[in-house]
């Protein structure tokens, strides 16, 4: 996924769509926002940076899970097996992005799953489809001809923390 913070208007529609499709409570969210001051006086502005699971290639959350509830699919999506999760929160502590939450009703630790359900990749995630400014692009990072690969090359998008965890979410900032 690519998130272009220059296009993001901070409307939170992506977060609301995510909450609805995942049946999350209002206080539960897989997407959070950082407001970062940019520029110098008198040309100061706030950059809205949506933050969610980065679906890391080298996922610290997966490495610490004692029950192996956190796993990576063949296509690189990091998921949580709700049947195996014991709610110990080790993965929450290990995540360098602070994007995992505990679902109050079940005690399971969850996070963005790119709207992947029942083991099958579906349409683009709800956050992409609902973005009014076109700030999000989703696709196959391994296909150099995909829209996302072309957009990453065109904009020089980078993972938010460099290659610390080999994130699969790229940002234009």
Predicted regions and their residues:
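Non-ligating segments of multi-cofactor redox enzymes
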Residues: 1-173
